[in-house]
């Protein structure tokens, strides 16, 4: 039986890092990103676009088991020059205002929101609704973990 630690809130954590998906992702992510950033740091002419490309590439390489990751990796790899790579799907996000109408066409509103979600998820426009909804949860979790890892890297470097 594997050893476990229980914290005060009765949450059980595995002591084996490979059993914790968040830890596995973070370890993979930093192992891809840190060497790339060190390499960029040696080149003082690195642009924001180049850094963003490396951040997105590390995200895609760290979560290859997901369809959105493979689409993102394909998109990033299709450009040999990171400065010409189109931005990731999270750029250009616009917030849709909900119309305040009673008894409106709710079905049409749901369809519109699903279309917007498909645009946000890498490869989402090529997925059916069930697959897209499954993938979006994983994508959001990986973005949250990416944010935590990037904040940690920034704190450690200052």
UniProtKB/Swiss-Prot annotation:
GO terms for cellular component: nucleus. Residues 94-143 form the bHLH domain. Residues 77-90 have a biased composition (Low complexity). InterPro entries: bHLH_AtIBH1-like, IBH1-like. It is found in: Nucleus. CDD domains: bHLH_AtIBH1_like. Transmembrane segments: none annotated. GO terms for molecular function: DNA binding; DNA-binding transcription factor activity. Residues 94-110 have a biased composition (Basic and acidic residues). One of its GO terms (biological process) is regulation of DNA-templated transcription. Its main location: nucleus. Residues 77-110 are annotated as: Disordered. Keywords: DNA-binding, Nucleus, Transcription, Transcription regulation. Belongs to the bHLH protein family. This is Transcription factor bHLH146. It comes from Arabidopsis thaliana (Mouse-ear cress). The lineage of its organism: Eukaryota, Viridiplantae, Streptophyta, Embryophyta, Tracheophyta.
């Amino acid at each position: 039986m594997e050893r476990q630690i229980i914290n005060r809130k009765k949450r059980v954590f595995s002591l084996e890092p490979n059993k914790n998906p968040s830890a596995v992702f973070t370890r993979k992510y930093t192992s891809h990103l840190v060497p790339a950033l060190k390499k960029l740091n040696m080149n003082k002419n690195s642009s924001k676009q180049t850094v963003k490309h490396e951040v997105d590439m590390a995200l895609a390489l760290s979560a290859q088991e997901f369809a959105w990751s493979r689409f993102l990796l394909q998109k990033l790899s299709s450009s040999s020059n990171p400065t010409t790579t189109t931005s990731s799907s999270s750029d250009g996000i616009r917030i849709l205002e909900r119309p305040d109408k009673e008894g409106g066409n709710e079905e049409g509103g749901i369809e519109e929101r699903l279309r917007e979600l498909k645009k946000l998820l890498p490869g989402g426009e090529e997925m059916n609704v069930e697959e897209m909804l499954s993938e979006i949860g994983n994508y959001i979790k990986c973005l949250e973990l990416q944010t935590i890892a990037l904040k940690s890297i920034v704190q450690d470097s200052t």
